[in-house]
Amino acid sequence: ITCSKVYGDIISCVGYIKGGPIACVGYLKGGPLQQYVHN
């Protein structure tokens, strides 16, 4: 599952299906951030 880039600084992204929306966890330079995107 691919996730949208945030500020183009996402190093890695793990996605999983959760109740319809895709919950993505991306790790930035400063730390983790959680974003929700729809496929």
Curated annotation (Swiss-Prot):
The keyword Nucleotidyltransferase does not apply. It comes from the Eukaryota. Keywords: Disulfide bond, Lipid-binding, Transport. GO terms for molecular function: lipid binding. Belongs to the plant LTP family. Plant non-specific lipid-transfer proteins transfer phospholipids as well as galactolipids across membranes. May play a role in wax or cutin deposition in the cell walls of expanding epidermal cells and certain secretory tissues. This is Non-specific lipid-transfer protein. It comes from Musa acuminata.
